[in-house]
Amino acid sequence: MATDADMAIFGEAAPYLRKSEKERIEAQNKPFDAKSSVFVVHAKESYVKSTIQSKESGKVTVKTEGGETLTVKEDQIFSMNPPKYDKIEDMAMMTHLHEPAVLYNLKERYAAWMIYTYSGLFCVTVNPYKWLPVYNPEVVLAYRGKKRQEAPPHIFSISDNAYQFMLTDRENQSILITGESGAGKTVNTKRVIQYFATIAASGDKKKEEQPAGKMQGTLEDQIISANPLLEAFGNAKTVRNDNSSRFGKFIRIHFGATGKLASADIETYLLEKSRVTFQLKAERSYHIFYQIMSNKKPELIEMLLITTNPYDYQYVSQGEITVPSINDQEELMATDSAIDILGFTPDEKTAIYKLTGAVMHYGNLKFKQKQREEQAEPGGTEVADKAAYLMGLNSADLLKALCYPRVKVGNEYVTKGQTVQQVYNSVGALAKSVFEKMFLWMVVRINQQLDTKQPRQYFIGVLDIAGFEIFDFNSLEQLCINFTNEKLQQFFNHHMFVLEQEEYKKEGIEWEFIDFGMDLAACIELIEKPMGIFSILEEECMFPKATDTSFKNKLYDQHLGKSNNFQKPKPGKGKAEAHFSLVHYAGTVDYNITGWLEKNKDPLNETVVGLYQKSSLKTLALLFASVGGAEAESGAGGKKGGKKKGSSFQTVSALFRENLNKLMSNLRSTHPHFVRCLIPNETKTPGAMEHELVLHQLRCNGVLEGIRICRKGFPIRILYADFKQRYKVLNASAIPEGQFIDSKKASEKLLGSIDVDHTQYKFGHTKVFFKAGLLGLLEEMRDEKLAQLITRTQARCRGFLMRVEFKKMMERRESIFCIQYNVRAFMNVKHWPWMKLFFKIKPLLKSAESEKEMANMKEEFEKTKEELAKSEAKRKELEEKMVSLLQEKNDLQLQVQAEADGLADAEERCDQLIKTKIQLEAKIKELTERAEDEEEMNAELTAKKRKLEDECSELKKDIDDLELTLAKVEKEKHATENKVKNLTEEMAALDETIAKLTKEKKALQEAHQQTLDDLQAEEDKVNTLTKAKTKLEQQVDDLEGSLEQEKKLRMDLERAKRKLEGDLKMTQESTMDLENDKQQLDEKLKKKDFEISQIQSKIEDEQALGMQLQKKIKELQARIEELEEEIEAERTSRAKAEKHRADLSRELEEISERLEEAGGATAAQIDMNKKREAEFQKMRRDLEEATLQHEATAAALRKKHADSTADVGEQIDNLQRVKQKLEKEKSELKMEIDDLASNMESVSKAKANLEKMCRSLEDQLSEIKTKEEEQQRTINDISAQKARLQTESGEYSRQVEEKDALISQLSRGKQAFTQQIEELKRHLEEEIKAKKCPAHALQSARHDCDLLREQYEEEQEAKGELQRALSKANSEVAQWRTKYETDAIQRTEELEEAKKKLAQRLQDAEEHVEAVNSKCASLEKTKQRLQNEVEDLMIDVERSNAACAALDKKQKNFDKILSEWKQKYEETQAELEASQKESRSLSTELFKMKNAYEESLDHLETLKRENKNLQQEISDLTEQIAEGGKAIHELEKVKKQIEQEKSELQTALEEAEASLEHEEGKILRVQLELNQVKSDIDRKIAEKDEEIDQLKRNHLRVVDSMQSTLDAEIRSRNEALRLKKKMEGDLNEIEIQLSHANRQAAEAQKNLRNTQGVLKDTQIHLDDALRSQEDLKEQVAMVERRANLLQAEIEELRAALEQTERSRKVAEQELLDASERVQLLHTQNTSLINTKKKLESDISQIQSEMEDTIQEARNAEEKAKKAITDAAMMAEELKKEQDTSAHLERMKKNLDQTVKDLQHRLDEAEQLALKGGKKQIQKLEARVRELEGEVDAEQKRSAEAVKGVRKYERRVKELTYQSEEDRKNVLRLQDLVDKLQMKVKSYKRQAEEAEELSNVNLSKFRKIQHELEEAEERADIAESQVNKLRAKSREIGKKAESEE
């Protein structure tokens, strides 16, 4: 650990990088209890520091730092590390490795602003959200050359380590920077680039001058300036980050051999182009749009025809438009200057701005809908004119292309109409594409500019890419990012543990290698392997009718339940809908696949793309040059056009995978360094850290994954000496004292003597390795031991100190005793006189001497003091001199050492240079000698060639003369001269072939074509020979005529002959000389040709291997196509079988319905039914037999498939062997290339070292210059030869590189094909049942092909032999010619006979050649014909396989849909029955409640009437009293009293009325409460409706929800019954009325029973219908089995059809018949498709019927719920009415009591005051009694009448209600019966149609079978004839060979 002095070089950054010494000491001395200090899981804070209070029964009670007491499980506590590990720089060194330890270490370091921390291989950085002085220039210099452990954690340390590793290990490096948006990835990437630009540029201070006009700024400036430009076009504001990079980038910085910066390049990934057209509210688009509109450069506003207000442009104003932390004006100037520095031309710069402005204008394009049409039309042309002007287009063409694009249909283009939405979508896609392509083009241009063409040796790559993303809504972009991180994490796991395990291996630890990279293999394979997610996505993109649902279904079929990493998402409230889940290493992510197909295809308007390609803006045309537009494709021709078309449909996922694979291959070739960036909080607050957020990122970016892997190994390792020194205290006796012992053995003995798990540690060569956690245990044991030792030591120290103190006390005691004794003695003699005298005299004796001594001592003291001062001054001077001398000495030593090192290096370099120079001189001499030899040979050859040509021309002239003379003599002589002329032509042809060979040396790729040309030349020679033959025949005829003339001239010629003899001798001698010269030249040429042939043989071998591989690839491609066509054919056959099955199912259903209709009618019908059943049983047996046969054939097919797979495996093995051979040759060539490169490199290094030596050592330079001047002449002489040789070696190396590229391309193709083969194997296993006949056909075709190949090879051999015979004949002709020339005059007669023989043999040979050629041509034709037949057969096989696959797929889908609908139907039936039962029970309860309610209303009305009568009586009585008062004047007082009482009664009545009003208010309040309760119930009902709808979508919870609703309804019914009982208890007084109601209820119950009986009958009918439906299902299953049987028959038919097609190819007449049959089958197929459509319509009809039933069930449920609410309301109202009636009853009683009291008072008053008026009173009383009687009688009568009326009304209502219910039930049943009858009729009709179709198919089958048998017979006859012909041809060939 560095001291504070060492940290001083970091300047003001030191406190932000490492703790001070004081803090470290304080941390180590902090009190700490290892057993009680723990981290605890917390709900809010994730983990908190706590102290253990107690433990009991698996529970632990802890107290947190905040004072909170918690009780947790034991697995929820984590041990805390000792204080010395606080703020540790490398978290991998911690004793306890777990999540809370990592979290709190990061938190504490972040709180101290130490933002960089190591975690094993990782460097973790936390965003500080403020500026820290840790990137200053002095920090860069401080980190330079420091090892990782020597300096604090920092991004500069990672960068410098990568740089140093690159220089020392000679290996490429990479730095992987990942993290979420806003974590600081881009900033750290900038710092890395800044660091490299600083340290690599500082190594070479003298900058090289760049050519004028090429670039502005140095390479360092350009690398740094690339960032502002990429950020302007690729960065944007997001919610988390104001400057978020919306793309990933991999920056490669290249360095030379000396570490100097050489060049750079950038690769980008996953640009978020959707941001161009859409942004969220809190975000904004890319910075460049807002920079342009900042008006910092007004000329841009004018040029782009835009305004400065972003809200004028829809694409860039959907979110925010300004960012507080970014100054758009300054950024614009930075972007503009970056464009200039990076060397963009002014035109390119203008084009960038114009295209950016055009994208903004695109967002403002308006379109509208035409009247009465869906077609879109432009809403104006102003914006389009601006956009078209900026893009160099015609606005009218642009609008036309957008509204009416051209689409390719077949081979023609048609114009397609677009809706408004489609046009807007197209415009958005084009805008995104333009921006994306412009961004990628800028990256390419930047790379071109950063490529300085300087020599570069190594590179350091910096990867800045988004981290793992888990959002609420995850789409395709998240899958790509997460897949990238999955691959990077796998790469990290593999790399990390490879390093770990290399350490174990180096230390000699026994360890079984574990590749932790394979932990993530399952998820990676699920995504990228064949039939993975990307594969299925790309496959779906190829199908035009594919949808998101079909994509989801394929994913589920392929992976759900088969792969643990693929799961079905769990629905959560508030979350976005998800379609599937993937288990990544960072967690489970739910993905939504909406729109993935469109995103992946990324379609563009091809017509507009065609306009872009023709744009006058060159940059735009360049951007879309490689995209195949509508016009471009139609106009493209040749191979190039086809290639573009093929590559135009490249999906986004395929491109992404290609880039990712390239990135991973780059990373695997480097040594990686990992940096993980973290966001501390969401609010961008400096210093604050959110625990859950940081933990989530640690999981996502693999830090915790790295800890997991680290824990599986031995993460903690300590040197033996350190371990012995620190832990010796644990058992000191284990290490013997007094003798030497090795630290390793001491550590082994020490650990062996301690009670720990011995499997938790291992001993290496130099270190002891511990598992995680064991060191913490050792630390605890050490602390305990130290505590024991310290307590013992303290005890001994205290005892020793006390003993010392006691000894001192004893000594003090003795001295005190002595002093006391002396004092006592002195006190005794003090007063003695002699003692007094002694005291006076003693001091006087030595006083004078002492004064002298004191004076002398003072003088000496002063002298010594002065001397001491002088000596101190001298000493200081000497010390200063010594320090300065030491410093000078050290400096001089350093200089001497440096000069010595430099001298040693220089000497070594000089020696190396001399050696290399000698080697080079030797090589140059060899090369010059070889070159001179070759030049001399060439010169001699050319001279001799010219000589030969001249002599040949002279000879030709002489021969022509001779021929003219000999033509007159004899015809044979003339023929031989013609042949001589032909031979001379052949010599010229041979010269031409030599010239061709020299050309082939320059262009080796044309070798194959040259061989073809030679072949053609041979054929031409044969043709010329045939022509010569015809000419000779004509000449023979002519010469026979002139024979007589020749005889006459013979005598003349004899004389001429003697004369010419001398000339001939001379010519013969000259020709002999020429031939000798020619032989010498030929030998030299052969030597030269031998060297050329060696090179050519190598190249030809490589070409042959390449051709073989290409053939294999073609064969594999053909095989793939065959298999795909087989799958397609299988699918079609399956579709046909499916249609047959559907037809037969309808037939069976009709039959079953007929049987049911006719069931039980008559005995005859019963017999018919029995017969039908017997037939059915027979058919079932036949079906079972057919299935057995089918299984047998399937087994045979499996066996054949296994054989075919074995053949394919052998082919693959052969290909692998070829590949290994090629790779071996490739490695040899690479080694040669490496040797050449190393030689060139050593030369360049030597040159550079020489230049340096020349600058540093001038003396040596003068001597070397003299030597160089002497050698310069020789170098100048050989420089031209060297340049020529270098060009030749460059050509050879280029050819080798091309071959390497070809080999790598072939190997990639091979890998792709092996993957395709694996996919096809899986397809083959599924589609194996339909391969019997195609496999036979394929085998027979292969057999024929092999036979033909053998014949062809035999014919080729025969042809070669004929050619050899021909050449032999030619050579013999040449020999005869020479003999003729030498002995022509002497032996003319012998020459003539020989010439005749030669002519005859030549003629025979020519005839034989013609015969062989004709035979070859015929064999070639038969081979071509058979190849065509094989190709046709393969196409048919592929079709059948494809049809089978399609059928199988449709079968599965149909079965799945059928089972789902069956399940839904059963569930709805159950729900319907339950709802019907509930509705019946509720309707009965409703009837009861209604009756009770009406009775209570009647009772209330009677009470009201009685109340009114009583009030009337009271008023009558008061009137009578008033009349009595008027009649009797004496009783005025009584009257007053009565009036007073009357007023009191009125007040009482008013009070009663007030109480009545109060009660009415109560009633109103109760009604209001009732309404509120009703609304609550309605709300609850609505909520339950929503729940029911949701639960119906999820079928698993339907039963529970129905049960809950049932329970609720039972509770409400119980509540109603309870209310009813209470009501009956309250209404005991009106039992008479209740009896009437009971009787009516009994009658209603009777009616209810009747209706229930009717409902039971209907239920029975319904059950019968269900049973019949189940019977129909069984019959459908039977029909399916019959369909399978028919499918097997169809397969047999297909086999027969294919057999007939083979025979058709033998006999062309049969071909026509078979094609007619195919047409017939096609018509059948179309009819079956129509039946399939009918079936689909029937299914849709059934679905609609099921939906109706579901709707009825829902209506029934709603009615039931309404009935419940009505019943509850009625019960409440009934209760209220009962309360009011009881209250009125009480009021009535009170009023009766008051009337009685009044009556009593009135009697008393009359007795007191009216003694005389008794008679009148009695009369009045009698009158009153009569009136009362009449009133009572009238009341009784009216009450009875009212009761009767009410009774009859209730009865009428009940009857009407019952009749309405009956009528509804009858109608419902009638509808059900009608529907069932309709179904029965449709099933009958379908069965009849199926029966007819089956009959037709059977007749066709019989007919085709008959024709098949005939065709097979004809095929056998034809095959036997072919075999005979082959045998004949072989016999003829053998005869010809024997004759020769």
From Swiss-Prot:
<feature type="region of interest" description="Actin-binding">
    <location>
        <begin position="660"/>
        <end position="682"/>
    </location>
</feature>
<dbReference type="InterPro" id="IPR008989">
    <property type="entry name" value="Myosin_S1_N"/>
</dbReference>
<keyword id="KW-0112">Calmodulin-binding</keyword>
<dbReference type="InterPro" id="IPR036961">
    <property type="entry name" value="Kinesin_motor_dom_sf"/>
</dbReference>
<keyword id="KW-0067">ATP-binding</keyword>
<keyword id="KW-0963">Cytoplasm</keyword>
<keyword id="KW-0514">Muscle protein</keyword>
<feature type="modified residue" description="N6,N6,N6-trimethyllysine">
    <location>
        <position position="130"/>
    </location>
</feature>
<comment type="subunit">
    <text>Muscle myosin is a hexameric protein that consists of 2 heavy chain subunits (MHC), 2 alkali light chain subunits (MLC) and 2 regulatory light chain subunits (MLC-2).</text>
</comment>
<feature type="compositionally biased region" description="Basic and acidic residues">
    <location>
        <begin position="1928"/>
        <end position="1940"/>
    </location>
</feature>
<keyword id="KW-0547">Nucleotide-binding</keyword>
<dbReference type="GO" id="GO:0000146">
    <property type="term" value="F:microfilament motor activity"/>
</dbReference>
<feature type="domain" description="Myosin motor">
    <location>
        <begin position="86"/>
        <end position="783"/>
    </location>
</feature>
<dbReference type="InterPro" id="IPR002928">
    <property type="entry name" value="Myosin_tail"/>
</dbReference>
<keyword id="KW-0488">Methylation</keyword>
<dbReference type="InterPro" id="IPR014751">
    <property type="entry name" value="XRCC4-like_C"/>
</dbReference>
<dbReference type="Pfam" id="PF01576">
    <property type="entry name" value="Myosin_tail_1"/>
</dbReference>
<dbReference type="InterPro" id="IPR027417">
    <property type="entry name" value="P-loop_NTPase"/>
</dbReference>
<protein>
    <recommendedName>
        <fullName>Myosin-1B</fullName>
    </recommendedName>
</protein>
<keyword id="KW-0518">Myosin</keyword>
<feature type="domain" description="IQ">
    <location>
        <begin position="786"/>
        <end position="815"/>
    </location>
</feature>
<comment type="function">
    <text>Muscle contraction.</text>
</comment>
<keyword id="KW-0505">Motor protein</keyword>
<dbReference type="InterPro" id="IPR001609">
    <property type="entry name" value="Myosin_head_motor_dom-like"/>
</dbReference>
<dbReference type="GO" id="GO:0051015">
    <property type="term" value="F:actin filament binding"/>
</dbReference>
<feature type="domain" description="Myosin N-terminal SH3-like">
    <location>
        <begin position="33"/>
        <end position="82"/>
    </location>
</feature>
<feature type="binding site">
    <location>
        <begin position="179"/>
        <end position="186"/>
    </location>
    <ligand>
        <name>ATP</name>
    </ligand>
</feature>
<keyword id="KW-0787">Thick filament</keyword>
<feature type="region of interest" description="Actin-binding">
    <location>
        <begin position="762"/>
        <end position="776"/>
    </location>
</feature>
<feature type="region of interest" description="Disordered">
    <location>
        <begin position="1912"/>
        <end position="1940"/>
    </location>
</feature>
<dbReference type="GO" id="GO:0005737">
    <property type="term" value="C:cytoplasm"/>
</dbReference>
<dbReference type="GO" id="GO:0016460">
    <property type="term" value="C:myosin II complex"/>
</dbReference>
<dbReference type="Pfam" id="PF00063">
    <property type="entry name" value="Myosin_head"/>
</dbReference>
<dbReference type="InterPro" id="IPR004009">
    <property type="entry name" value="Myosin_N"/>
</dbReference>
<keyword id="KW-0175">Coiled coil</keyword>
<dbReference type="GO" id="GO:0032982">
    <property type="term" value="C:myosin filament"/>
</dbReference>
<keyword id="KW-0009">Actin-binding</keyword>
<dbReference type="GO" id="GO:0006936">
    <property type="term" value="P:muscle contraction"/>
</dbReference>
<dbReference type="Pfam" id="PF02736">
    <property type="entry name" value="Myosin_N"/>
</dbReference>
<comment type="similarity">
    <text>Belongs to the TRAFAC class myosin-kinesin ATPase superfamily. Myosin family.</text>
</comment>
<dbReference type="GO" id="GO:0005524">
    <property type="term" value="F:ATP binding"/>
</dbReference>
<dbReference type="GO" id="GO:0030016">
    <property type="term" value="C:myofibril"/>
</dbReference>
